[in-house]
Amino acid sequence: MRSSPYDRANLIADFDSIRISLASPEKIRSWSHGEVTKPETINYRTFKPERDGLFCARIFGPTQDWECLCGKYKRMKHRGVICDKCGVEVTLARVRRERLGHIELASPCSHVWFFKGLPSRIGHLLDITLRELERVLYFEAYVIVDPGDGTGLSSGEVITDERKRQLDQEFPGKFIAMMGAEGIKELLKKIDVESLSEEIREKMKTEQSQQKKLKHAKRLRVVESFRKSGNKPEWMILDVIPVIPPELRPLVPLDGGRFATSDLNDLYRRVINRNNRLKKLIELHAPDVIVRNEKRMLQEAVDALFDNGRRGRVLRGANNRPLKSLSDTLKGKQGRFRQNLLGKRVDYSGRSVIVVGPDLKLHQCGLPKKMALELFKPFIYHRLEQRGHCTTIKQAKELVEQQDPVVWDILEEVIKDHPIMLNRAPTLHRLGIQAFEPVLVEGKAIKIHPLVCTAFNADFDGDQMAVHIPLSPEAQIEASTLMLSANNILSPAHGGPITIPTQDMVLGCYYLTKSRPGAKGEGRTFASTDDVLIALEMGEVETLTPIKLRYTGKVIDLVHAFDTQNILHTEPIEFIKQYMDTTVGRVILNDNLPQDMPYINGLLKKKGLAQLVQYCYLKFGLHVTVHMLDEIKSLGFLYATRAGISIGIDDMVVPSEKAGLVRDAEKEVVLVENQYQDGAITHGERYNKIIEIWSKVTERVSDEMFTAMEEDDRTGRYLNPIYIMADSGARGSKQQIRQLSGMRGLMAKPSGEIIETPITANFREGLNVLQYFISTHGARKGLADTALKTADSGYLTRRLVDVAQDVIISENDCGTTEGIYVEPIIESGEIIEALRDRIVGRVALEDQKDYEGNVIVGVNQEITEDLAAAIQAAGIERVKIRSVLTCESKRGVCVACYGRNLATGRLVERGEAVGVIAAQSIGEPGTQLTMRTFHIGGTATRINEQSKQDAKSDGFARYIGIQTVRSKVGELIAMNRNGIMAVVDDKGREKERYPAVYGARVLVEDGAPVKSNQVLLEWDPYTFSILTEVSGVVHFKDLIDGLTMQERLDEVTGMSQLVVIDSPDEKRQPMIQVRPEGATGRGSEAKKYLMPTHAHLMVRDGEELHAGDVLAKIPRETTKTKDITGGLPRVVELFEARKPRETAIIAEINGTVKYGEVTKGQRKIYVEGEDGEKREYALPRGVHINVQEGEKVKAGEPLMDGPRDPHDILAVLGEKELQKYLVNEIQEVYRLQGVNINDKHLETISRQMMRWVKVEDIGDTEFLPEEIVDKFKFRTENNKVLEAGGRPAQGKAMLLGITKASLSTDSFISAASFQETTRVLTEAAINGKVDYLRGLKENVIMGRLVPAGTGMEYYRQVKIAGEDVVEEPVAEPLDIIPGYDEETRLQYAGGLPEDTGEESLAE
């Protein structure tokens, strides 16, 4: 007896893993409830399903609940009876969603996935090529099944029709040849997987050719999968095909008597028709040709049913649209996985437009009464009955529909302490869904607290948000402890506050803390803050009046620190009845700050407010901070209103110096043009210089404009509103204001190059037609980019989530002794990110001691803010910390290696889904970045190329590996690449270091004293020069006019220049030799300089030179705008571990460079190590070689120009270096955009990319050659083999891109729902893979709790206290979510609150 539909629900939930494998014909028949033999669907008159048809009720179940088809048995009492008239079982109609049927095929058919999916599984097993196999299956050729004796044939050989006839005459009846899937099935039956596996392994041992070895390896992979999984090869050929339940391929009546049907029905009908016709033909003993043709048609119909379009022509429906086959229902965004299993719709939800709710508290949101009434209906009904307002649900319904006054009171009660979740699409990170306490509001719009807008990325120009209601008590508790907006004030991406005042609030606070000299009551002295406030009320002083105040307590004085906004790192000063210069507004602000907060004296801008929030969080915790945020919000709005700021056209002050600056620039441009005319500079240099001139002028004009606005003093006490907005950080940036009232500056062409004539006008003066036209490019490009990049960025996030979704904090300490070193990030001498900021929240791997030897941080201790500051103060250069990269946890990572959970500021807890958090933190700004170009309106902003380096502090110059020569002018010129100019103090400690680039002028001698701002080095940023190290005479070698060099006449200047070109003759190596004077002998004394393609020669043959003179210049490409366009694709390139085009070849060992000869158009270069080891590299001709002969290089240094390939870095320098490279490169892109992401997120992703090993020598392990396996698996297997005394496998570390890594995961469900669904499932089925459901995605798909957070095994035992309490008749409602100001609203720490009653919840 089959289990009834009731018990089935329970069966489903209770399993630990899921296995996929091939189904045998017996298995398919055992699933089936009957054979479908007729292609009919339903009767057109009665609309009842036809018997034995595709919708047959006898096979699939009744169409009405508890009712057989003919109506003889109705109602529940006949449950389980099978009707004697129509043969239908009396049961629920929903069994039509789960009962399968089957079709017995008259002739076997191959399964298209296994025959056609690459690599062809059937082909590999039989060792038949795909083309031959196809010919056999589609009845164009015969295959020998039994070669017989003495025929000279071999089993599995494919022969043509003629050859078969010929053989039939030669050896009648001796051999058997067959056509179609039958033949293939016979062959597959004969295969003995065990012996075949042995045979191939033997062959591989003896095989010499690499090609054949690979072929065997591929074949072995398929054979092994059958051997291990217990699947039988002949199951890849189908005798029976299952018919999926009719409700999953419904036939829906449309109005007008037509029907809309699922494509699957068409495909099944086709199979049934052809199958029935074939049966008849076989019965009639029709001619072979006809039967064969019918079999081929059947095979094609079955192929189309499983995967339409995989082989042959696509079957199309009535309107020429390809039919959706079974494979298509799984694939892609609209397929089963992504549409129905990963993205379900939920009830108890609603959506509406949002408006701002400035009077709400941070944990509240306004919910329209109408919505609340609908969403909380069941709760209201329950409460109405409970209170005795009605006795049945029906009455309750009526009360609610009539909107009886009592209903509103009850709604208030129900809503109290019942959190709701708000979500704004797109949900780019976890803060896109937060929980709030609802406050009922009139109208139809949801009200939102202004401080959570940043997290939701919401504005009020018509955005909509969705509301969801957590129903179960557990869900409510989780929502209110983990997701409440007041508990999420830190960003998981960087650990800084995310609920920071923006826009109006910033403006209000800026205005409030500004001082305006000359205001009423200026300079008065007050004894206390209270006196100040009284004086303000009396009208003696104004808000912006500067005053003196006598104060006792701590003061953070930003005024003395020149209004830096650095609240966190400014030392508070202790005042004891001392006088301080402040303003009335600042007194008001400080009056509203928390009790023990130091007095903050200074002008607060956006950054200052952000730091204030962080300071408060660090010092006083969450509770106080939330309270303060609401205070600041109210103050900000109040004073933004009181300030009455408004913009007029006169506020766009055009600086008086503008005209002069533009005139000067035009003169400079003329000078440059003249230089170009005289041939002193190349075309590229001219372009670069002009761009440079205009960039500088634009900068100058905008600086002048800002000063003019700041000092804009029309009425004696006027504050320029535009300046206030930009300066405070409320709205608008320097660039935008520059366009309003400075000059628009340089614009970019659609190709990305910069147009050299800038727009000198601004929007206030207005643009002329040409200027307007030039502007349109940028504006359009901005819009197009936005649309395209949003999609790209979303796809990147999806891949990141997929690769890291199963990284969960799994244990407290993995016990590793490995770690990574962290240093401050320094670019061109400036500290971009201090050591302090990089190590905070990580766990130390070794004791960190100061110079006296006192331990600052011990082993495995978390580095807090204070400790990090102490380490930096002690002058420690680098710190070794634990990192996700070196974590030894087999699954997930451990607490100690991950460190602090950035969203709480405490150590991370077990069960935290850090992989998903990492993916979201990296993906979310991606979308922000894509929008970046859009706002500025496409004005070209170039990073001005640096051309000199000045010292930041006083000290002494020290050369580190700089080799110099003196030029004829007597200047020192750096002649090597990796030299460094350092500035040291009198004790010889390094304070700054700068790279001395090749060809730079070194302006200070070694050891000379240096003043701060003194220029140390100068160089030409636009060209790369090749210089001579010796004085002497120039000899051209292989520089032949018209062959390897060309004299290019410049039309504009009439000057000619020699340019090296790529010559077709491979033997020639263009080079310049400089022979010192007096050297008579040929050869040896001459210095050789190779000339790369496109070099402009600056000397002529036979000319005399002095050391340090320029031989040739290579123009640099610098003038493309640096926009995130370089950004997003670059990030994707790094995450996908793609090889960059034209990668630089890097040295694999430390050693000395020797030049070799040129062969086959490639130049050989040797690196000789100290120990005599020699490596040779072939560099393409015409590239610029970075190293001179005899120069020393380190392993990993590039030998030529070009980007480095991450795979090379892994091979040469190892995993840690590669990881450092990846993290730094990706960070650089984000840093350019001013996006702050914590390193540990990037580390989490790169760990997933680097956990793979490629097996090179299998030893005695179970691995297959060239297989890519998880390194933990690799290690375990090797240990197992070693214990047994076998030979372990050898492998090399691999770097997989995120897509590849996602598809290599253990879980086939997760991989199939990501990409290439059919390929993944084919592979999994043949291997008989088992999915142990360890990641998040698999569990969501299977409809289980995710194994992270509270769903983790570790927390599953936690029960809600009070679940089995017997309810007293009148229990007062207990609060689950205590009031706003009580201590309980602290962070959720692992257990759950104890005192929860069930009263106020849904039972």
Curated annotation (Swiss-Prot):
Protein name: DNA-directed RNA polymerase subunit beta'
Known catalytic reactions: RNA(n) + a ribonucleoside 5'-triphosphate = RNA(n+1) + diphosphate
Binding annotation for Mg(2+): D459, D461, D463
Binding site for Zn(2+) 2: C814, C887, C894, C897
Source organism (scientific name): Solibacter usitatus (strain Ellin6076)
The keyword Transcription is assigned to this record: yes
Keyword annotations of the record: DNA-directed RNA polymerase, Magnesium, Metal-binding, Nucleotidyltransferase, Transcription, Transferase, Zinc
Signal peptide: none
Cofactor(s) this protein requires: Mg(2+); Zn(2+)
Lineage of producing organism: Bacteria, Pseudomonadati, Acidobacteriota, Terriglobia, Bryobacterales
Record's subunit section: The RNAP catalytic core consists of 2 alpha, 1 beta, 1 beta' and 1 omega subunit. When a sigma factor is associated with the core the holoenzyme is formed, which can initiate transcription.
Gene: rpoC
Entry keyword Zinc: yes
Single biological process term from Gene Ontology: DNA-templated transcription
Pfam families associated with the record: RNA_pol_Rpb1_1, RNA_pol_Rpb1_2, RNA_pol_Rpb1_3, RNA_pol_Rpb1_4, RNA_pol_Rpb1_5
Annotated residues for binding of Zn(2+) 1: C68, C70, C83, C86
Cofactor binding note from Swiss-Prot or TrEMBL: Binds 1 Mg(2+) ion per subunit. Binds 2 Zn(2+) ions per subunit.
UniProt-listed Enzyme Commission number(s): 2.7.7.6
Family: Belongs to the RNA polymerase beta' chain family.
Any one annotated GO CC term: DNA-directed RNA polymerase complex
One term of GO molecular function: magnesium ion binding
Role noted for this protein: DNA-dependent RNA polymerase catalyzes the transcription of DNA into RNA using the four ribonucleoside triphosphates as substrates.
UniProt xrefs under NCBIfam families: rpoC_TIGR
